[in-house]
Amino acid sequence: MEKWARIKYTPNLPLGENGERVTASQKHIELSCEAACEGMVLLKNDRNVLPIRKGTRVALFGKGVFDYVKGGGGSGDVTVPYIRNLYEGLSQYTSDISIYDKSVRFYQEYVADQYRLGIAPGMIKEPALPEDILADAAAYADTAIIAISRFSGEGWDRKVAGVDREIKCEAKDLVEQGNKIFDHGDFYLTNAEKKMVKMVKENFSSVIVVMNVGGVVDTTWFKKDDQISSVLMAWQGGIEGGLAAARILLGKVNPSGKLSDTFAARLEDYPSTEGFHEDDDYVDYTEDIYVGYRYFETIPGAKEKVNYPFGYGLSYTTFLLEDYKAEPFVASAADEVGKSDSDLADAIVASVTVTNIGKIPGKEVVQLYYSAPQGKLGKPAKVLGGYAKTRLLQPGESQRVTIALYMEDMASYDDLGKVKKAAWLLEKGEYHFFLGTSVRDTRLLDYTYELSKNIIVEQVSNKLVPTSLPKRMLADGTYEELPQTEPVDTYATIFPRPKNWKETIEHDVLKTPVVRPQDRFQLFLPPKEGDPKKFIEVAECKVTLEDFIAQLSNEQLASLLGGQPNVGMANTFGYGNLPEVGVPNAQTCDGPAGVRIAPEVGVVTTAFPCSTLLACTWNEDICYEVGVAGGEEAKECNFGAWLTPAVNIHRSPLCGRNFEYYSEDPFLAGKQAAAMVRGIQSNNIIATPKHFALNNKESNRKGSDSRASERAIREIYLKAFEIIVKEQSPGASCLQYNIVNGQRSSESHDLLTGILRDEWGFEGVVVSDWWGFGEHYKEVLAGNDIKMGCGYTEQLLEAIDKKALKRKDLEKRQSESSRCFSNSTKLKAA
C-alpha cells in the first residue's frame, strides 16, 4: 500500500535513514562522482605526465575551466543544488598542487559575464588570452591544463561546416549562437580555441587537455601533437564532474573508462556524415549494419582513419593478460528448453587471468569479440559479444575473468532471403573469437566454432520493410541496390486535417483535461454496495482486470488512453486519472541524467553523468547503482514512472542528443541500460526505455523519415531495446517522434505489436513521445497504449462511431496499461 498511499497524498517525504532526504543527498552526489570517475577515459599520457605529482604548480586555460557542462539540454537537464567545475574540483586539493590565480580570475569573470547575458553553458566563445597573463603564468608554472567544453541538446543537431541552409529545428536561438561561435562546426576547435592552444603549447613543457563534451569530437589536434602530453576525455560528468576529473588528474582515482565509440580522424570519415543534413525530411541509413567499429574494422581502407578505437582507454598502471582459454559450454536440460535447433551448441566460455603488474591499484576491462563467416549475408569483421570489468586490483593481484557468449546471439538477420527470408540464422562456416582490452587490442582464441550447415535460430516475418532506401553498404565497401516498393499512404485519415497540419503541434489544439482537486480523495474511499469496482481491488486480486475494464464507459476508456495533467512536482504529465473508479493520476518525470523537476518548484535533484560516460564505465554494477539512486529520488518526489534510459545508437557524431545515449554498439548500450532499468525498478518505479526507435537525428524530428534496411533496424537500432525487454521486463517503453520507412512510429503495428510484443514478449505500457503528430485512433490500432502529453478523447469516440475503431481496441490498450500499473509493485528487483 505504500506506493498507493503516496499517490493519494502526493507527499515529498524523506525516504532516507534517520528521516533524511535521499533526493540530492550526499550519498547520491558521491555516487554521481564515483560513476563519473569510473567512466572518464584517459586517451593519451605521454611521458607519464599524469597523474600530476604533488607539489606541482599548474596554470589553467580555456573558458571550459569555468564554463563546465554537467549534461545536455532538454529532457536530460536536471535542476541541481550546485555544479562543481574543473577549477572548483582542483581547488579541493590545494595541499597537493598550487594553481596560478590570474588566469583563474580572468576566466571566472569572463564566464560569469557571459552567463549574465543569458548564454548557455558550453555555448560561450573562447576569449582572447591576454599575453601578460600567459607570460606570468609561464613564469609561475611549467604544467598547463586546458579545458574544452561543448553543449548540445534536445530538438537540434550539432553544427557542421558547409551547410548554409536553414535547418528545421526547435532551438533556433542555440543554433544561431553556435553559428556565431563554431567556425568549422562544433566537432572541431574554433579558431579562437586553436589560437589559445597554440599560445599555451609555446609556453609550457607539459600540457594536459580535459575534454568536457557529450559526444564524439575531433581528436586529431592532440593525438598527433607531441607538445600535448596528456588528454582526459571527461565527458559531461554530472553535478560533480569537475571533482571527478580533478581526482583522476591528481591520481586520487586511477582511470578505468573505455571508449563506447570510435574516434575517427575527421568528421567526414564517418559514413553517416554524408547525407546527415542533406534533407530535413529524410535520412538514408545507407551504411546499413556498418556503424561505428563495425565500419572501421571491416570496410577496406577504413582502419587507417581511426585515432582511438572502440573499447580503448589507458590506465596509470599496467595489466598483464595471460592464460587465455575458450571452450564450449552446454547448459542443463532445463536451460535447453526452447532452444530452436538441437545442432546449436549453447555457448562459448572464454576466460583470461588479469594481473596488475604496475605500482598502483586499478581496474581493467576484458572484451570478447566474435567473427562470423561472411557467407551470403556479409558480416562485420568483429562484433562485441561480451565484457567484464575486474574489481580494483592491487599491485601484484590477479583475477580470473570469465565471459560467456551464447551461440544464438551471433545470429544475423536475413531480410531479403539470401539464405532464408525473415529469419535469424547462423551461416555455415567458422566462427572465431577474440579476447582483449579494445576492438584492436585482442588475441585470437584457440577455439573455433564450426557449422557444417546453416542454422535457423528464429523464423519471424518481414516488418518495417523500407520502400524508398535505394542502396546499402556491403562488407567490401560496395553497395547493393535494394528493391523499391510503392509506399503506402500512411497519412490517410478519417478526419479532416488543417492545411498546415504538419506544422501544427498537437498540444496547441488538444485540451488537457482538468483535474478536480477533490477527486483525489475518492481514490481510496471504502467501497459501498452498488459502487463501481475500484482499481485497487485489481491490484489486490479481488477483482479481475477484465471485469474492471468491462464496467467502464467508452468515454472513460478513451480518457484513460491519454496523458493526464501535472500534479505535485511533475512537468511531464501523468497516466490514469479516473478517480471515480480509483485510478490515480500517476506522474512521470524526465530524464536520462536524473529526475528533472522545474526550477520554480524549488526541489533540487542529483545530476548523474551523461549516458555516454556511463557506457564508458563498462560496469553494469555502477549503472545499477545509478538506477537505484535515481529511482529512490523519483519515488521520494512521488513519481510513478521515470522516463529513462535513452538507448538510441550513436549513428553519427552530429546527433544533438547523443549525450543521452550510450554507444555506437547495441550490445554495450543494451547491457548497461538494462542494469540501470533493474536498479530503477527495484524501487517499484516504472522504467521507460526510449526512444523506440531510430531516433538518431533531432532536426525536424517530428517529420523526418529514417530509411533503413530491416536488417540494420533489427541488428543495430532495435537490439539494445530487445536486450532490455528480454532481460529486465521494463514497465514501459516510450516511442520516438520520427517516421521509420514511411510510417510514423507511433502508428506502426509492425514496431509496436509485431516486434515489441509478439516477438519479444513485452508486457508493459507503450507511450508516445510528447505532442507528436500521430493520429490517436491509428496509434491505438498500432499498439500505442497512452498518447502523451494528452490524448484525444473526442477523436477516439468519433472513430468508434465511424467504425474505424471498436470498443475492444480501447479495452486492449487499457488492459496493457492497467496490468502494468497494477503489477508495478511486482516489477523485477535487485
Swiss-Prot record:
Chemical reaction(s) catalysed: Hydrolysis of terminal, non-reducing beta-D-glucosyl residues with release of beta-D-glucose
Annotated EC: 3.2.1.21
Enzyme type, top EC level: hydrolase
Listed SUPFAM superfamilies: (Trans)glycosidases, Beta-D-glucan exohydrolase, C-terminal domain
Gene3D superfamilies, per the entry: Glycoside hydrolase family 3 C-terminal domain (3.40.50.1700), Glycoside hydrolase, family 3, N-terminal domain (3.20.20.300), Immunoglobulins (2.60.40.10)
UniProt GO BP: cellulose catabolic process
Active site feature: 769
Segments traversing the membrane: none
Keywords: Carbohydrate metabolism, Cellulose degradation, Glycosidase, Hydrolase, Polysaccharide degradation
InterPro entries: Cellulose_deg_GH3 (IPR050288), Fn3-like (IPR026891), Glyco_hydro_3_AS (IPR019800), Glyco_hydro_3_C (IPR002772), Glyco_hydro_3_C_sf (IPR036881), Glyco_hydro_3_N (IPR001764), Glyco_hydro_3_N_sf (IPR036962), Glycoside_hydrolase_SF (IPR017853)
Annotated coiled-coil segments of the chain: none
A GO term for molecular function: beta-glucosidase activity
Superkingdom: Bacteria
Pfam family, one: Glyco_hydro_3_C
PANTHER family given in the database record: BETA-GLUCOSIDASE
Recorded family membership: Belongs to the glycosyl hydrolase 3 family.
Biological function: B.fibrisolvens beta-glucosidase hydrolyzes cellobiose to a limited extent, cellotriose to cellobiose and glucose, and cellotetraose and cellopentaose to predominantly glucose.
Protein name: Beta-glucosidase A
Annotated organism of origin: Butyrivibrio fibrisolvens
Gene: bglA
